[in-house]
Swiss-Prot record:
Residues that bear Phosphothreonine: 479
Biased composition (Polar residues): 1031-1040, 1054-1065
Family (UniProt): Belongs to the JHDM1 histone demethylase family. JHDM1D subfamily.
UniProt-annotated stretches for the region Disordered: 448-630, 719-755, 811-841, 871-1080
Xref: InterPro entries: JHD, JHDM1_Histone_Demethylase, JmjC_dom, Zinc_finger_PHD-type_CS, Znf_FYVE_PHD, Znf_PHD, Znf_PHD-finger, Znf_RING/FYVE/PHD
Residues engaged in binding 2-oxoglutarate: 193, 246, 259, 266, 323
Organism: Mus musculus (Mouse)
GO biological process, one term: transcription initiation-coupled chromatin remodeling
Protein name: Lysine-specific demethylase PHF2
């Protein structure tokens, strides 16, 4: 039995759990604990000698380090870097002076630190509590020390220890660290900062402050029965020896932290979480040599805060800080997430993800805590709406930040990284939609309450408008300018449009006096940033009042949606406003529903000045959303009515409906948190933010349709031309299709074009569903030929060839006024049909005649040209192809390219059928027949010279077509029955030249389109093919017989003719049923033309 080897002075076998070192002299192994060598010291030893070898070989030698300036205690030149945490670094840090933290740290007694205090003053700066009285903090007695920690936590507990000098982490057992702590000879500086003891017996001795319990997301909103356990980040024990240093960092997840010093003292170096500082921190932390750079030297100010025994320090989210322990210290700490600074928490979390930091104090499942908080916020919003109360602004803002983070986490490309932290039984898309809806409702309710408070204060200042113009309000007073601007907007709207107020608004205000409004307009100056597309140059813009109001409202929260139409148009009476606000709260959901239904029509029909103004509002998020829209709307209407010389209608209902429609649609200025939704259903927003790409004008037919219902214009062609000029742009960013929400426009097209009602809506919808691309004289030219070919290809696949015709006809009639379209169509026909017959030319001439008649009718009618206009006439007799005979349909279905000048109607009867495998192409068969006939004739002539036997008469002069067809059928039979003859290698030389194949294809296409062609016509076509193939065949048999055959063609198939009597053996081998005679074989070939459609 083999003995187990033993090692070391203790003579014990090898133990994998114990550190061992080899002696370089005797080559024996020794336990580190037996010879007094620590595992962390072993890398610094160059040559090790055991205690026995030290007597003969001397002591162990250490490695010669070239970077002792980083860690050594001696003085070094200034040009060399110093390692953070080294003895030299600590000495330099102690000697430095920093700004006092009294400027940024608030001293608050524990009894005053409540949730109300936090919400009122915010939690953006550190808070120092001198004593723990009233704080609700529970900690052990001051006699509690490190040995007690080992007793209550357990000596075998593995802890993460930081080597301060090297700024590296390692693991030790707690008992080993305690032994190091109490040792008198500390060779290294070790630091324990993340001993989380919430699941140990020591947890009963420590309780976080009450304010932490009330604010913490994990403590309040994380379910106890959740599948993922709560993160254990609330109770940490810090055991730090003298000169322990923790470099600058941001707590994981942007969490806030609390520190209580039980024994000793700690120094905090604090840096504000400004944007510049966070960017500098991210750059510094990502550098490879960041441990040799002191981060405080890169920022403008770093504050020094000393926390002594018995004091508690609260550090807000995002603060960058480092800690130094001047004396041995025992402290307790904890981290928590809260709703007072959600944005900073998210930013710090994103920085942490980008840097991929592996902090010792990680905040596990940070995203899960955010999901639970989002669910809680949704319930809080619903409860506040039921009770009629409003949530605090920081909660609304936090909900926005969280909802934006939820959307980014649930995107398709990012879901794989974040789905692990998604709570079980959660529906993230539904939560995002509901939360966005509640945020929007809460914002709308808060905006309707604001005018109530400010209405009385603003009524006095509205009376004297001239004084306001001379002495504009101070930027500090934000409320009066808002109210004043609302009333001035009312004045300008009513004065410019000259229409009564909508009847549905209760208690409409008295129209203002004209002199004041005129003064305001005449004295206006172009100051501040204005919209270029809002009005024409002849119409004045906003005056100094707008500039001062913009400046005054910059400090206010920019409203995402200017949703105060009723309070804007009502008198500043508190009771009236209160009643209206109550009505608004009840009608919020109905308004959102009506808005989602009317969004499509309004987006496609409102004036361009409104579209441009809304684009600037979305991009710049200006606080004057509603008022800008109101001014732009009035100016645009004034310009529109003046340019067309139309008298405004006297009925108040038109402008009332129009104005309410305008307000309902202009109020929502969408942001990333908004959804257009009903009470329970999600409405997809088809209108993303428009980009400024196209021409500034747009379709104004929405306004014209409403006016046409009440008055008839004096000159209808003038009105149509004006509308035609205004409709000269299409949004390049997105293509909008609207067929069923514009009955008025469709009716107008029907009335003016004079076509039948049957089928016009189908053609309108077909043309718009395909693309509805409109090209007018003032707009851009049509797409390139390659783009048009691609469009036509897609249309042909969908059997919708009408749209291309509309597209070409529209551009042609607009540009050439009748002449260029015919040339364009002729050019297209000429390019595509070079090899067609006379029948196609006759049809083309007929189409061009019809086109000229149609263009003449088009110019006489001066039709309304927009996306709904259908240029082709609808009186064609091909509207009902079902009742046409089969022969008539076959007659007009030549295999010709699509002509853009043809009349638009339903598709021709025969449609493209899918390619079937195993079918033979007729053109190849024809070429094979011609080649086989030629081969047969050559062999017959050879046999005629050799033997004087009896044979069939040759069709030299008398009947060339009949004999050629017979010989062609004979050759085709021999070629087609051989498998090799159907391959491309054999068929291509058989046709002799490409011209022969193309000619055969064109001839076959003409003959194949007739319904029941007789055999004579086909035999003659085969003969014609041979005589006209490539110009190499003569008109006689002798000329063809002298032609040599192409190399490699039919070499394996050269056999005598099937009609020869000397070929009986071969004839018996190849005979099949129905293929015995030449007539039967010819009939088989002709069945291809009889039943199939020839596709080239």
């Amino acid at each position: 039995m083999a003995t187990v080897p033993v090692y070391c002075v203790c003579r014990l076998p090898y133990d994998v759990t114990r550190f061992m070192i080899e002696c370089d002299a005797c080559k024996d192994w020794f336990h580190g604990s037996c010879v007094g060598v620590e595992e962390e010291e072993a890398p610094d030893i160059d040559i090790y000698h055991c205690p026995n070898c030290e007597k003969t070989h001397g002591k162990s030698t250490l490695k010669k380090k070239r970077t002792w300036h980083k860690h050594g205690p001696g003085p070094t030149p200034d040009v060399k870097p110093v390692q953070n945490g080294s003895q030299l670094f600590i000495k330099e840090l102690r000697s430095r002076t920093f700004p006092s933290a009294e400027d940024v740290v608030s001293r608050v007694p524990g009894s005053q630190l409540t949730v109300g205090y936090m919400e009122e003053h915010g939690f953006t700066e550190p808070i120092l509590v001198p004593k723990k009285d009233g704080l609700g903090l529970a900690v052990p007695a001051p006699t509690f020390y490190v040995s007690d920690v080992e007793n209550y936590v357990g000596p075998e507990r593995s802890v993460d220890v930081t080597d301060v000098t090297k700024q590296k982490d390692c693991k030790m057992k707690l008992k080993e660290f305690v032994d190091y702590y109490y040792s008198t000879n500390r060779k290294r500086v070790l630091n324990v900062t993340n001993l989380e003891f919430s699941d140990t017996r020591m947890s009963s001795f420590v309780e976080p402050p009450d304010i932490v319990k009330k604010l913490s997301w994990v403590e309040n909103y994380w379910p106890d029965d959740a599948l993922l356990a709560k993160p254990k980040v609330t109770k940490y024990c810090l055991i730090c020896v003298k000169d322990s240093y923790t470099d600058f960092h941001i707590d994981s997840g942007g969490a806030s932290a609390w520190y209580h010093v039980l024994k000793g003292e700690k120094i905090f170096y604090l840096i504000r979480p400004a944007s510049a500082n966070i960017s500098l921190y991210e750059r510094w932390r990502s550098a490879s040599n960041h441990s040799e750079m002191f981060f405080a030297d890169q920022v403008d100010r770093c504050y020094k805060c000393t926390v002594k025994q018995g004091q508690t320090l609260f550090i807000p989210s995002g603060w960058i800080y480092a800690t130094l322990t001047p004396v041995d210290c025992l402290a307790f700490a904890g981290h928590f997430l809260h709703s007072l600074s959600v944005e900073m928490q998210m930013r710090a979390y994103e920085v942490e993800r980008r840097l991929k930091l592996g902090s010792l104090t990680q905040f596990p499942n940070f995203e899960t805590a955010c999901w639970y908080m989002g669910k809680h916020l949704l319930e809080a919003f619903k409860g506040s709406h039921k009770s009629g109360k409003q949530l605090p602004p920081h909660l609304v803002q936090g909900a926005k930040i969280l909802n934006g983070a939820f959307r980014s986490w649930t995107k398709k490309q990012a879901l794989a990284e974040h789905e692990d932290e998604l709570p079980e039984h959660f529906r993230p898309s539904q939560l995002i939609k509901d939360l966005a809806k509640e945020i929007r409702l809460s914002e709308n309710a808060s905006k309707t309450v604001r005018p109530e408070v400010n209405a009385a204060a603003s009524s006095d200042e509205v009376c004297d408008g001239d004084r306001e113009k001379e002495e504009p309000p101070s930027p500090v007073e934000t409320t009066p300018p808002r109210s004043l601007l609302e009333k001035v907007s009312k004045k300008k709207t009513s004065k410019t449009v000259k229409m009564p107020k909508p009847s549905k608004i209760p208690k409409p205000p008295k129209s203002p006096k004209p002199p004041k409004t005129l003064k305001l307009k005449d004295g206006s100056k172009k100051k501040g940033k204005k919209c270029k597309e809002s009005a024409s140059p002849t119409i004045p813009n906003l005056d100094l009042l707008e500039a001062h109001t913009k400046e005054a409202l910059t400090k206010m929260e920019p409203p995402k949606k200017g949703k105060t139409p009723k309070s804007v148009l009502s008198v500043p009476n508190k009771d009236t406003v209160h009643t209206q606000n109550d009505m608004e709260r009840l009608e919020i959901r109905e308004q959102t529903k009506s808005k989602s239904e009317a969004k499509w029509k309004y987006k496609n029909s409102k004036p361009d000045s409104l579209l441009k103004m809304e684009e600037e509002q979305r991009l710049e998020k200006s606080p004057l959303a509603g008022n800008k829209d109101k001014f732009s709307f009035s100016f645009s209407n004034r310009k529109l009515l003046g340019s067309k010389a139309l008298r405004p209608p006297s009925s108040p209902g038109v402008f009332g409906a129009l104005q309410s429609f305008k307000e309902d649609k202009a109020k929502p200025v969408r942001d990333e948190y908004e959804y257009v939704s009903d009470d329970g259903e999600l409405k997809i927003d088809e209108f993303p933010i428009r980009r400024k790409k196209s021409a500034p004008k747009r379709d104004l037919s929405f306004l014209l349709d409403k006016k046409e219902a009440l008055l008839m214009p004096t000159s209808k062609p003038k009105l149509d031309s004006a509308v035609y000029k205004s409709d000269d742009s299409s949004d390049e960013g997105s293509l909008h299709i609207d067929t069923d929400t514009k009955p008025g426009r469709n009716a107008k097209v029907k009335k003016e074009s004079g076509s039948s009602a049957a089928g016009i809506l189908d053609l309108l919808q077909a043309s718009e569903e395909v693309g509805a691309l409109e090209y007018n004289p003032n707009s851009q030219p049509p797409a390139s030929p390659s783009t048009q070919e691609a469009i036509q290809g897609m249309l042909s696949m969908a059997n919708l060839q009408a749209s291309d015709s509309c597209l070409q006809t529209t551009w042609g009639t607009g540009q050439a006024k009748g002449g260029s379209l015919a040339a364009h169509g002729a050019r297209k026909i000429g390019g595509g049909n070079k090899g067609t017959g006379k029948r196609l030319l006759k049809r083309t001439a007929k189409n061009s005649v019809d086109l000229e008649d149609y263009e003449e009718q088009d110019h006489l009618d001066a039709c309304f040209k927009d996306s709904d206009y259908v240029y082709p006439s609808l009186e064609s007799d091909e509207d009902n192809p079902v009742f046409k005979s089969r022969s008539k349909k076959r007659k007009g279905s030549d295999d010709a390219p699509y002509s853009p000048t043809a009349r638009v109607g339903p598709s021709v009867p025969r449609q493209d059928r899918p390619v079937r495998e195993g079918t033979r192409v007729a053109s190849i068969e024809t070429g094979l027949a011609a080649a086989a006939a030629k081969l047969s004739q050559q062999e017959e002539q050879k046999n005629r010279k050799k033997k004087n036997t009896k044979r069939k008469p040759a069709p030299n002069t008398a009947s060339p077509s009949i004999s050629t067809s017979a010989s062609a059928s004979t050759g085709t039979t021999s070629a087609s029955t051989t498998p090799a003859s159907t391959t491309p290698a054999s068929t291509t030389p058989a046709s002799t030249t490409p011209a022969s194949t193309s000619t055969a294809s064109s001839q076959a296409s003409q003959e194949g389109s007739s319904p029941e062609p007789p055999p004579e016509s086909h035999s003659s076509s085969l003969a014609d093919h041979e005589y006209t193939a490539a110009g190499t065949f003569s008109g006689s048999q002798a000329g063809r017989a002298s032609q040599p055959m192409a190399p490699g063609v039919f070499l394996t198939q050269r056999r005598p003719s099937a009609s020869s009597p000397n070929n009986t053996a071969a004839k018996g081998k190849r005979t099949k049923k129905g293929m015995a005679t030449a007539k039967q074989r010819l009939g088989k070939i002709l069945k291809i033309h009889r039943n199939g459609k020839l596709l080239l």
